[in-house]
Amino acid sequence: MDAVAVEPVRSSAVGLPAQLRDLGHQSYGPVWRAMQRFTDARDERTADEVWVVEHAPVFTLGQAGKPEHVLAPGDIPVLQVDRGGQVTYHGPGQLVVYPLLDLRRLKIGVRDYVCKIEQALIGMLDEWNIVAERRDGAPGVYVGGAKIAALGIRVRRGCTFHGLSLNVDMDLEPFHRINPCGYQGLQVTSVLDLGGPSGMDAVKAVLLEQLARQFGLVLQPASALPDLSLPA
């Protein structure tokens, strides 16, 4: 995956600085542990960060996840994780964004945080005339009843980790091996299937711009990756 352009991604007004890190292609586990370490170590002086990544194939079960919603995982690993929500799939061709934000600094609550992420996704899809919507009680973004983006977050001491996944140009077959987000028979779709671009960079740029606008951030690309080592 190509690196994000070096120019800062700005909101429409002067905003709070946040480090933007493009992790490329990574397994889920090391990134998850790195998010935990970052969140545990941060304090009120720590700058916010936004991480973008494509994961190797994996099913993740959130805190509300039920094993029976994993129908036939086959050769794809299943991980129990500490985010909210139920079961979802991550894989190549899916854009995953982890906003590591201090909600107290942004002066917003958890509900507003979720709504702003959903609105950023809706605004991004509108760039390609894809009409999307949110659903009460079912976080994420939907197009014509099919889910195109999933949300699963965790808030610790007022700071967020985990985040969103957007199906861009990917093999959707693994979603048939689960009840996505705990809903039997829930249909899923992708940006490409709805007439949008297949290129990850085009989608990434617009989504980051929308997220920066929603949260009032100035995203400053950082070349260094977080420590992705797993604990012994």
Swiss-Prot record:
Keywords: Acyltransferase, Cytoplasm, Transferase. Catalyzes the transfer of endogenously produced octanoic acid from octanoyl-acyl-carrier-protein onto the lipoyl domains of lipoate-dependent enzymes. Lipoyl-ACP can also act as a substrate although octanoyl-ACP is likely to be the physiological substrate. Gene3D superfamilies: Bira Bifunctional Protein, Domain 2. One of its GO terms (molecular function) is lipoyl(octanoyl) transferase activity. NCBIfam families: lipB, PRK14342.1, PRK14345.1. The record marks K147 as: Lowers pKa of active site Cys. SUPFAM superfamilies: Class II aaRS and biotin synthetases. This is Octanoyltransferase. InterPro entries: aa-tRNA-synth_II/BPL/LPL, BPL_LPL_catalytic, Octanoyltransferase, Octanoyltransferase_CS. Substrate binds at R83, G84, G85, Q86, V87, T88, Y89, H90, A150, L151, G152, G163, L164, S165. The active site is at C181. It comes from the Bacteria. Pathway: Protein modification; protein lipoylation via endogenous pathway; protein N(6)-(lipoyl)lysine from octanoyl-[acyl-carrier-protein]: step 1/2. Residues 44-219 form the BPL/LPL catalytic domain. GO terms for biological process: protein modification process. Its EC number is 2.3.1.181.
